[in-house]
Swiss-Prot record:
Name of the protein in question: Small ribosomal subunit protein bS16
GO process annotations (BP): translation
Gene3D superfamilies with a match to the protein in the record: 3.30.1320.10
Any GO MF annotation of the entry: structural constituent of ribosome
Annotated organism of origin: Cyanothece sp. (strain PCC 7425 / ATCC 29141)
Superkingdom of source: Bacteria
Alphabetized SUPFAM superfamilies for the sequence: Ribosomal protein S16
Amino acid sequence: MIKLRLKRFGKKRAASYRIVAMNSRDRRDGRPLEELGYYNPMTDETNLRVEPLVKRLKEGAQPTDTVRRILEKANIFEQVRA
């Protein structure tokens, strides 16, 4: 199953995350199928690649809880339903 999840990068105690599409059995920092954006919790900054995200969600990719909240803030699910 394909999951949309966060992949950690950045410095110690100053983490940032990439939003990636990965197989659910792969480890957190393994090789992703596709990078779909990034999220910085320190500044609450997000940058999303909308078209590939919508495509992955329509194909049945399951977002984790944290990624779901980030996508809801950006109104991505409204584009999936349309």
